[in-house]
Amino acid sequence: ARFIDRIGKGIRGAPRDALIADITPPEIRGAAYGLRQTLDTVGGFAGPLLAMALMAATQDNFRLVFWVAVLPAIICVLLIIFGVEEPEATRPPAQLRSPLRRENLRRFDTRFWWLVALAAVLTCARFSEAFLLLRAENVGLAVTWVPLILIVLNAVYALSAYPFGKFSDNGGRRRLLIWGIVLLIASDLVLALAGNIWLVGLGAAIWGLHMGATQGLLSVLVADAAPADLRGT
């Protein structure tokens, strides 16, 4: 199930970010991506909160939690079908073909490839949220209350993403990226040394700040560096 979930995330992520870049003026692109991150993360905050309440009320009925989680996904599909208007293609349909072509790859400049390398390095330093939950259990948090850690992370992420996005529109993108990396290092250190649930919560909060500072920013930088007709690629 987790594997299929990651496939779904991979499919939806690129076209979603490309669509935002297509319909947003460049001068407010950081704020737009920040707002998108905030709204997306509200679900990550409300979801664990609801899961925790359901687990407590149903004596850890995991099956019911997953059935309830299906409903927001269905609503999202309906919104895409009936509420999202896709911009016109930049090329005639007859010219649309597989993007994995050598001539297309040559159109990405050095800035873009440096961003790809940076994102790859950041991914190596940022472990899965599953390990964060395991860390919470490791220091003694009961399984019913483990989602609290995700609530802390996503609450901080949601509250910080839009302000960080606005800041990046004011010419602070390089500084914001550096501070985002510093926050990731700090989070990893706190979680590695944590001996109680309070320090795990602090590490999760710092991780949320890192996500708020970098996730939307990386999308903005890619949108700025990539040719308009290859942003989804």
Q: Would you name each region that the model predicts?
A:
Residues 130-149:
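Short amphipathic helix-loop junctions that connect adjacent transmembrane helices
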